[in-house]
């Protein structure tokens, strides 16, 4: 099912502020309870992460009123004695979950608090496939360097959820939606007729507003004005500038389906502090959650994918992660092609440890070189301060690797980029020692400037 179709809903109407944060424990509990109820009804073990992912996806589909979801359907689960599990097709009746979602989620009284949470939950859970399959859908469609895909996070979630958390979605996603809007004006899904100009203008202004709130450079905002008018000559220059003049992306710490299903206590749950680290450590200490993959060689990397998914660290410096979590972090290129889901099997236990922690970065933190395919710039997820690295001296080389070029804004943005590149530190606050708020400085001796997709 496609999840990146054009959003034609227009800018959402202004509503009274809904305090989602205080409802996090309750929403986590409700998702977990629905997962456990559905699994127990069909005798599906939730101590296997593959099974949790399937069950969790079904609950998510019910919560978002997915049109492709059938009341009764067949799904594949790992079933059988420990150590001898086999993929088994099971018929699942989800009518009770559909009824629950209708009253608890879809009701207008609750929808406003649920959708921002569901958006973050979907971003977190879709990260695993993004890492394993390593595709570049947004940058390829925009015809810019694949190195910039780190600023297309969240592209795979439903548009109605993107609207609930627009600042948690990468700016290139908004840029792609704007380009599609101009090239293929949307139609009303009911009448099949093109939308009236006021509706299209409303959608365009909403997208442009999201972009301008995320991008902090004055020249970047000037280029966005050009895009709004349908002039895309400066696209590659704008995209390259994101690596130096880094945008605001609101990061949150969100548990994945296997962690939710295996968490016993959500008291005090938040999306932004040490509770998330502690919750993962408790699940790890139980030694009951089993991880799936191609074979045992993948176990450490599959456990690291949990970290990348929960903390949204796919663009973070691996040196920072090694210091925070106390162990070597792997690059995706160290492993071969991932197996088909039908060939996945239990390969080990979920393990998690940490030595330091930091809150998620929700503001702008503060590199560019040739036509490299891998990641060449850190997109910080943690607020803690750390050294800032530039793997480039100008934006010339990266811009030449993209499909479209311009000189209109080039000199302006180059000068502005240099000011940011000269900064030696990025991040806005400090790291903390495990178990409290004792401030700790990131060590300058740590091995940094390596990336998951490098």
From Swiss-Prot:
One of its GO terms (cellular component) is ribonucleoprotein complex. GO terms for molecular function: RNA binding. GO terms for biological process: symbiont entry into host cell; viral penetration into host nucleus. Residues 1-22 are annotated as: Disordered. Its main location: virion. Keywords: Capsid protein, Helical capsid protein, Ribonucleoprotein, RNA-binding, Viral nucleoprotein, Viral penetration into host nucleus, Virion, Virus entry into host cell. It comes from the Viruses. It is found in: Virion. Belongs to the influenza viruses nucleoprotein family. Encapsidates the negative strand viral RNA, protecting it from nucleases. The encapsidated genomic RNA is termed the ribonucleoprotein (RNP) and serves as template for transcription and replication. This is Nucleoprotein. It comes from Thogoto virus (isolate SiAr 126).
